[in-house]
Amino acid sequence: MKEIKGIFKANDLAKYINYKYLNMENKIVKEISPLKLQKSLYFCFAYWGGFIYSGEKNKSELTSSFNKYLFDDRIEAWVYGPVVPNVYRSNEYLQECNPDEMFKGNEYVREFIDGILDDVLKVSDFNLVEVSHQDKCWKNNFNPDSLTHNNEIDKDEIIREYAREI
């Protein structure tokens, strides 16, 4: 069995994203779309990893105790941007989420993720797609001629790209 090196499983983080969306005020659509869920997962992973990686490079005490991988699940370059396939193929994110239990001992991680989600969940699905299509890690791995569109994106490549933005 493969050792999980992420803080969470992607499906658990997806449950939390869905929980946050369902508890948002003034949302236009009642349920989170698969596109918004996928882009939320991606941007949470990318910004968290970039933040921790840049802290490691600067020898920050704050970030040294955190894992740079929010989750260890595979991320692929699909037509509408980066996708976590095992989340896409399951409906686990619709299950109940207990945020207090999930983030026990990881309150700082929760605050960080909430900051990302407060912005990302307000943006339209296709604006999120547009933003993700600007990322070099997606551009370098997406093959429009492939019938499967499932090239894996290296997680460290994502993290390094976002570390430059921080």
Regions found by a protein language model. Give the residues of each.
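Domain-edge interaction signal
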Residues: M1-I166
